[in-house]
Amino acid sequence: MNFCYDVLNYKYPSRREVVYGRKGMVCTSQSLAAQAGLDIIKAGGNAVDAALATAACMIVLEPTSNGFGSDAFAQVWMDGKLYGLNASGFSPALLTREALMDKGYEQMPKFGWEPVTVPGAVSGWKKLHDRFGTLSWEKIFEPAIRYAEEGYVVTPVISKMWRQAWDDYEESLSPELFEEWRKVFAPDGHTPRAGEIWSSKVHAETFRELAATDCESLYRGRLAGEIDSYSRTTGGYLRKGDLAAYEAEWVQPVSTSYRGYDVWEIPPNGHGIVALMALNIMECMQFAAGHDSEEVVHRQLEAMKLAYSDGQQYIADPRSMKVTTEQMLSKVYAAYRAANIGQRAAKPQYGNPASGGTIYLCTADGAGNMVSFIQSNYCNFGSGIVVPKTGIALQNRGFNFYMDPESANCVGPHKKTYHTIIPGFLTRNGKAIGPFGVMGGFMQPQGHVQVMMNLIDFHMNPQEALDAPRWQWTGDMNIEIEQGFPMDMAGRLKARGHHVTVATDSMNFGRGQLIFRDENGILTGATEPRAGGAVAAW
């Protein structure tokens, strides 16, 4: 007898606890990908090899969030030092404000060729592999190729996102562009339902070509030619020259101290410093009440609004920024901003400092090496553009550009836009604690702040810190809170002037993972119930 049940609705919250390991650990939102990454460690690979294998698997297992056309960022703790990688691509040389205005655009389109930027993730993979990798590309890509060729069972959350993408692209794309997306991602005439099997031979072949060319084909080989040809024939801006000119870059992570801990993020063009600015503001305050206090939530929200207002005003391609990262992270400036927080909700305004669909994963090996890695096509599958015969779904990161010529983030040729994806890392006294991240667009800095405060201020264990109900600022005076706060929380916040919505769906509140390593080498991992993920441990 077959049971009849709904895999998209869960009446009772899952009871999760932290997971322990010693020799290796991988956390991500897809259990098959986590297991594949751990298998790489068991085969003799290190944390970077595992991160690359997991990231490759996620392109197949969660195509609703990332792909060959993604951007990526990473923080790597290796041999006692923290390294940062910015693998975000720039806009095509042909993408100018004037070209868009000539087509009648007053703001950046969300889908189609206009928001497509150079995919940076694969170049980032190569940078990581060249510097830290120990296994061959053939070995690293083996699990992803297997899932692409043999297929896998689509999970409930992913099936829901897949269906939403169909609706978005069918409405927004030309029939020609939508048909290429449909051929790969809905070959049976509908998107895969939960429990159905999806496979993609073209994904497997692209992985094989990347392995054979040391990931060069996407930028200076056959795959680059396929992208160029399709772009030219369908009205796109991206050319082989743009791809050949791009290379991911190593960067120095930036940090702030928060109550004795150092919280690390990638510097702009990403908005990780928004989380650091908010933590700087919060450090100016002391909290007698706990996480569920309306006073705490009010102050967190006001700090987040101030930090985000500054971030959205100033963060852009570093070559175009009008203030420095150091100015934005000044403790003196944070104290000035904190003094603006009162008992009532305030309309957010940026200050004047003195002269970010996504997947997140983290890995650790037995030698103490750890990786915080994030990769994204931005909105679901991205732009909706799928290059024929390759499985390459191109991102729509350019949607974050502004059309205002006075903005540092104004669209322009070979320019990096304001970026939402941010991998985090935590240290104390120069020693690694571990990687953490919360995927989910503009929720990401808000998630980072809440998870860090849950751990440091409210002394929650890692699983509690992820499980705890969250709030998010959605713009102007508007906020959303999850179910799980005290029943009178919404009313109390409304009395302070916040415009409050109690969300019925937790999908928009981020989906996080973390791994911490103690002084004895014990690994502690956690992943949250908002995602269908898992911790794979050894």
Write out the residue ranges for each language-model feature.
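Glycine-rich phosphate/pyrophosphate-binding beta-alpha loops
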Residues: 264-272, 358-362, 374-385, 438-445, ...
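Short beta-strand scaffold segments in enzyme catalytic cores
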Residues: 66, 71-78, 359-364, 423-425, ...
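Internal maturation/activation junctions in enzymes
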Residues: 3-6, 284-377, 389-390, 397, ...
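Active-site rim segments in enzyme catalytic domains, especially the processed small/beta chain
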Residues: 60-77, 81-86, 237-239, 369-434, ...
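Extended C-terminal subregions enriched in glycine
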Residues: 367, 415, 448, 457-507
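Short, small/polar residue-rich loop motifs at catalytic or cofactor-binding pockets
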Residues: 250, 355-358, 419-421
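Noncatalytic scaffold domains of N-terminal-nucleophile
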Residues: 1-35, 39, 47-214, 218-220, ...
